[in-house]
Amino acid sequence: MLVVFPYQGSSIILESGNVNDYEVVYPQKVPSLPKGGVQNPQPETKYEDTMQYEFHVNGEPVVPHLEKNKGLFSEDYTETHYASDGREITTSPSVQDHCYYYGYIQNEADSSAAISACDGLKGHFKHQGETYFIEPLKLSNSEAHAIYKDENVEEEDETPKICGLTQTTWESDEPFKNTSLLIYTPEQNRYLQAKKYIEFYVAVDNRMYRHYKRNKTVIKRRVYELVNILNTIFRRLNFYIALIGLEIWSKRDKVNVQSDVKVTLKSFGKWREKKVAATQKEYNAQLLTRIDFNGNTVGLAALGALCSVKYSVAVIQDYSKRTSMVASTMAHEMGHNLGINHDRASCTSCGSNKCIMSTKRTKPAYRFSSCSVREHRRYLLRDRPQCILNKPLITDIVAPAICGNYFVEVGEECDCGSPRDCQSACCNAATCKLKHGAQCDSGECCRKCKFKKAGAKCRAVKDDCDLPERCTGRSAECPTDIFRRNGLPCQNNQGYCYNGKCPTLTNQCIAFMGPNVKVSRDSCFTLNQRGKGCGYCRMQNGAKFPCAAKDIKCGKLFCKKRNSKICNCLISPDDPNYGMVEPGTKCGDGVVCSNRKCVKLQRVY
């Protein structure tokens, strides 16, 4: 019989802050055996792949099922710090036997958990619609833990925190509601449902290093907890985040970290761009800093820039003791990178909690609103960012292969996740080998564990400018995407093919504003000759340059809703290319946009 000793406390100081109402529990580990009876022998590790605990909340038993987050670190994960003489020291530690878990509550469909088990249980879980936090009490010779709700934590600073991204929005959010009526094609559904991967790099500035008393172990544990929560949040969007590197600026900052968040973001973006150029490895990067940004701002990121060479970055103020608060900000800024705007007043689908893309932050958030999900899907279908579809290359892997992390590595034939998560009929989840008689596990050219016949269509035509791809009969993967020659007419002569797409002004307006929109009248585009406000052709070092008269439809995009006469445009102060007419767009008969100029087809194709 399980024995627990809960009691109520009035006030206590925990690692996460002052808590004025809490319950003390003594989590008991629950032995777990598969239905067959005896477990297969596993390599000796400090932390088990799966664990179960039981404790009581408000007198009711709660049993979290926890599974090690095997995809938390990439196989070529590195850690970098700097010696006292400024020398860069980079190591490739073995971090696969870690103590960071995700999971669910037994017998609860809509539940979740993100827990670290490094030194007791610390994290949060959702139980019966409420979010609870658990944390060890650090009492000598005691397994006591505190459980509390968010509203029981005394605020360090009651001022609502905000994101630094500001931009114009359409005069109503009606178009975003209408997007829910769109019906996706089978090809679009396959793309949206495909697993997506973000290779993630975290830099910690010198202020944060000094704030945590130059203790790299404490900093690493905090970052790991943050990324574990981030993973739990983004799994709902079918994204898997792999930490590929952690860099601690232990000697001095590598970028210009200022209270002006925009200056810091720009400086960090340039640093990342140089680092990517040196390593030829693409990733999304965030800078964690202890500097106090101006006003109530705690983060900033570029919108829709996840795969951008220059803008796939964000800066985050480590403003709270509570990892849940900082992780919510990290998720918010990564959401911007994934093309998601701030929520509008009508976007309420996160229960009693605030949604992640809320404009103000006073409490932790763990879910995206339905508006955010629609905007994210629209960004994916419009921009088709390729960097998120690529698993890390086997040739990049340095550390030993880990079966069960969804990454097919050296020595593996497949990897469908843990035995509990695996849904493949072709892959043995315990060994990461194909089952007897199977040729493949997944891929557009794999069906019922066999290669599809040569000539079978594996990628349908997406539009006028695309060409179908067919299986070879020798591989599970669909051949490289090919498309019609640039410059050929498309969509009833409304546009010209450009890199497999048919970019038109109308399609771009629909992509930004939803259905029932049109391109604005020509007089709106003459604003691009002003070189200020919403009208310009290019921006450099903050200065806006006007369009020549013949190039006005290659600058800012202007759209209208129904019979509106307003000249609508969309801008982002952090991405000068946001809301601009796309390259290759038809700007007249026989002419297209190239480098913000309207030029003849023959010159560019």
UniProtKB/Swiss-Prot annotation:
Snake venom zinc metalloproteinase that inhibits platelet aggregation and degrades fibrinogen. Glycans are attached at residues 178, 215. Its EC number is 3.4.24.-. The lineage of its organism: Eukaryota, Metazoa, Chordata, Craniata, Vertebrata. Expressed by the venom gland. Residues 1-11 form the signal peptide. This is Zinc metalloproteinase-disintegrin-like BfMP. Disulfide bonds join 307-387, 347-371, 350-355, 403-432, 414-427, 416-422, 426-449, 440-446, 445-471, 458-478, 465-497, 490-502, 509-559, 524-567, 537-547, 554-593, 587-598. Residues 400-486 form the Disintegrin domain.
